[in-house]
């Protein structure tokens, strides 16, 4: 992989950037011990265990057994959407072999909590490192992902020595479920845009007693991280993103002047590829409720909608299971099913279009690290990144796509260690 770093004091911005195409742009370390209030009050932090009722799982299996798949033109693959043969195989595995209880037990091996913020119960994992001086790190997922994307990197981040790393690179890890996702409550009012979600996460970290912390994310997690860095700059040690946002520099007659040809070609290639993968944006950004009636009622439909994105946004040669196992895919999909959150999670696209931020996020002064994966859904040239962020760390990855933590955990963990090492 290519890797470049510059001292922060030089304020030198070096970056390759991933462009957010969702249209929602309108949209050093101090480590305090967490203070978890044990009394019954509005700020109480409560332990939480995942325990899906048996009847929910029985109903899921009954629905899977009654699946009615549509026809498919013979000889077609994934260009019309989710491939029927693969979906049928996935459904059979889901019904006959996938063990949610086994996955539930693994997930419950981590410390889960809930706390009320902004009128919502917010679910999160909180794993503290035993290493003195560990940096608190907020990991934020996007759509159609969830907190489960990050569970395989908790160990390497909190206990690097156990995974062949340097204990000095340790982190305390906080992984929330965004409002409307997973085991967090669903907002019951309009306007829950990325800004509002960033406020919730800032309140969560404050409640845990972390005065300063790092943030990492992709997809909506990157968007929310940018808002955090803009509105809570004094709290962030550093911002790491595998989905860096950035538009053309303002006031420049020719925004492509001086941009390397290779970057322009890569941006065009990514834009062409994503043009065939972006129908969901319009649906979820305009009529998420209508879509939800189908996806919340049919597990096969839900699986088809989600697995299409994992297939289209990841780095593989046609074999999806060369990068994700069926269990990984189905744990995430089942989480959406048992919590009935596919509709509430999709509404962020609608809200980001219709609820403008109340605070303008300008240039990000917080030191920013970028991990550029070759099969990310879009790409932004260097000059655009320089106009948006104080990027002090840039890594061009040899492989990987949109779901970096799940697809290439070792690469992401290594880059997080490298980036934050210069900020300790």
Residues of each region from the PLM?
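Glycine-rich "HGGG/HGxG" loop immediately N-terminal to the catalytic nucleophile
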Residues: 100-102, 165, 178-192, 226
């Amino acid at each position: 992989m290519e890797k470049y770093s510059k001292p922060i004091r030089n304020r030198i911005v070096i970056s390759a950037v991933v462009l957010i195409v969702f249209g929602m742009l309108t949209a050093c370390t101090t480590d305090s011990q967490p203070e978890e209030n044990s009394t019954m009050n509005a700020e109480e932090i409560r332990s939480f265990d995942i325990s899906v009722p048996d009847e929910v799982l029985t109903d899921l299996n009954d629905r899977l057994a009654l699946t009615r798949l549509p026809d498919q033109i013979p000889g077609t693959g994934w260009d019309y959407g989710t491939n029927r043969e693969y979906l049928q195989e996935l459904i059979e595995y889901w019904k006959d072999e996938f063990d949610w209880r086994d996955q539930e037990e693994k997930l419950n091996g981590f410390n889960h909590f809930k706390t009320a913020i902004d009128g919502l119960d917010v679910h999160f994992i909180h794993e503290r490192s035993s290493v003195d001086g560990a940096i608190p790190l907020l990991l934020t997922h996007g759509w159609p992902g969830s907190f489960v994307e990050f569970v395989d990197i908790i160990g390497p981040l909190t206990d690097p020595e156990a995974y062949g790393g340097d204990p000095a690179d340790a982190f305390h890890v906080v992984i929330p479920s965004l409002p409307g996702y997973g085991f967090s409550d669903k907002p019951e009012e309009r306007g829950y845009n990325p800004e509002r979600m960033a406020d919730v996460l800032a309140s969560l970290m404050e409640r845990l007693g972390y005065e300063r912390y790092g943030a990492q994310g992709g997809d909506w997690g990157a968007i929310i991280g940018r808002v955090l860095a803009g509105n809570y700059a004094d709290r962030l040690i550093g911002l790491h993103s595998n989905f860096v946002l950035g538009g053309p520099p303002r006031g420049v007659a020719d925004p492509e002047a001086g941009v390397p040809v290779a970057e322009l070609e890569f941006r065009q290639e990514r834009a062409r590829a994503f043009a065939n993968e972006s129908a969901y944006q319009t649906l979820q950004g305009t009529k998420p409720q209508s879509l939800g009636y189908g996806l919340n009622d049919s597990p096969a439909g839900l699986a088809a909608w989600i697995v299409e994105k994992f297939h289209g946004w990841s780095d593989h040669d046609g074999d999806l299971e060369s990068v994700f196992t069926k269990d990984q895919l189905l744990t995430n999909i089942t989480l959406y099913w048992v919590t009935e959150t596919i509709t509430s999670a999709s509404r962020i696209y609608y809200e980001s279009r219709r609820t403008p931020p109340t605070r303008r996020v300008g240039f990000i002064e917080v030191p920013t690290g970028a991990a550029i994966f070759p099969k990310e859904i879009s790409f932004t040239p260097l000059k655009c990144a320089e106009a948006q962020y104080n990027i002090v760390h840039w890594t061009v990855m040899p492989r990987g796509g949109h779901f970096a933590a799940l697809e290439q955990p070792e690469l992401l963990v290594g880059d997080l260690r490298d980036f934050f090492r210069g900020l300790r």
